[in-house]
Amino acid sequence: DEKGEKISKSKGNGISIEQWLRYASPESLALYMYPNPKRAKKLYSEVVPKTVDEYLSFIEKYPNQKPSDKITNPVWHVHNGKPPKEKIVMPFSMLLNLVGSSNAENKKVLWKFINRFHKDIKSIDHPILDKLTEYAINYFKDKVEPNKKFKIPDDKEKLALKNLIKSLEKINQVDKPEEIQTIIYTVGKENGYSSNLREWFKLIYEVIFGEQDGPRMGFFVSFFGVKETISLINTKIK
């Protein structure tokens, strides 16, 4: 596990290989083992999303690398010299946040949101992403949802979040993620967080997602939907 102790299911201090394969692909596990395949590894649930996102990053880089660099890319070895050719649409961490925000019980619901932001893609053409939607739901239900701690904002924090809603109501659904991110920054600065914007985003994450960290909010709002994000915030500050 994360402390280097033998995994004990009864103690709940790690995950088994079988559990890993419920939450992520065999290729992600192979990547995790890749640096030192014979060495005992710390196997715990928190490392799964990070490893999956690293795997996706390597897949994304591979097509544009020089031949000499391709053979040093771990996915070249993981896939026996033939990595899949798939455009990476979003990180696994974003999918996890989407599962929580949308209350998705199945991948059809997730694909509905994916297609809102990427209208032209189909699950049949994106097998990696399609499988990731299943993994994300499994991981969220088992490892994320039981540990969520939603913050109840005080009056000052509620006012800041209400001002965020007012600003979101003025923007267009087609606004770019970077523009939305700037708007969220501005609201934070105007509501007492100018010297510590990290605390502003921490407030948003804890209230909306029940976690101290989360996705880049401009991208999330664009992806999840402006109206849906406003509704989500409203339900958390009532």
Each language-model region and where it sits:
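Basic, alpha-helical terminal appendages of large translation-related enzymes
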Residues: 104, 111-238
